[in-house]
Amino acid sequence: MNAIPLEHGLAVAGVLFCLGLVGLMVRRNILFVLMSLEIMMNAAALAFVVAGSRWAQPDGQVMFILVISLAAAEASIGLAILMQLYRRFHTLDIDAASEMRG
């Protein structure tokens, strides 16, 4: 019943994770950094689902639900921070956040 071999699914998850990591390191726009984090979290969730389906265990799907709920919380908090940074500095550049003073 397994349509996707374990190696192929983990390879796709690894490629997605690496793409998210490259986007995280290269981009300076905080919106793109948040999108890269989402890609990385979805890659980890895909790895959980693929590994769980390999051994016919529902644990992968349970972890997927956990990762999706964490991603939703991360996105809402990240977008709130993004809006505050834009209101204060009128830019979405990450380097502007290093100029914040307490």
Curated annotation (Swiss-Prot):
Please give, as recorded in its UniProt entry, the membrane topology of this protein.
Multi-pass membrane protein
Q: GO terms for biological process?
A: ATP synthesis coupled electron transport
An MF annotation (GO) of this entry: NADH:ubiquinone reductase (non-electrogenic) activity
Q: Which GO terms describe its cellular component?
A: NADH dehydrogenase complex; plasma membrane
Per the record, the similarity remark reads: Belongs to the complex I subunit 4L family.
Which keywords belong to this entry? Cell inner membrane, Cell membrane, Membrane, NAD, Quinone, Translocase, Transmembrane, Transmembrane helix, Transport, Ubiquinone
List the transmembrane segments. 6-26, 30-50, 62-82
The catalysed reaction is: a quinone + NADH + 5 H(+)(in) = a quinol + NAD(+) + 4 H(+)(out)
Is RNA-binding tagged as a keyword? no
Query: Mostly located where?
Result: membrane
**NCBIfam families listed in its UniProt record:** PRK05715.1-1, PRK05715.1-2
The EC number(s) given in the record are 7.1.1.-
From the Swiss-Prot or TrEMBL record, give the protein name.
NADH-quinone oxidoreductase subunit K
Which Pfam families does the annotation name?
A: Oxidored_q2
To which species is this protein native? Pseudomonas syringae pv. tomato (strain ATCC BAA-871 / DC3000)
The record's function comment reads: NDH-1 shuttles electrons from NADH, via FMN and iron-sulfur (Fe-S) centers, to quinones in the respiratory chain. The immediate electron acceptor for the enzyme in this species is believed to be ubiquinone. Couples the redox reaction to proton translocation (for every two electrons transferred, four hydrogen ions are translocated across the cytoplasmic membrane), and thus conserves the redox energy in a proton gradient.
Using the UniProt record, name the top-level EC class of this enzyme in a single word.
Answer: translocase
Q: How does it assemble?
A: NDH-1 is composed of 13 different subunits. Subunits NuoA, H, J, K, L, M, N constitute the membrane sector of the complex.
Could you tell me where this protein is found in the cell? Answer: Cell inner membrane
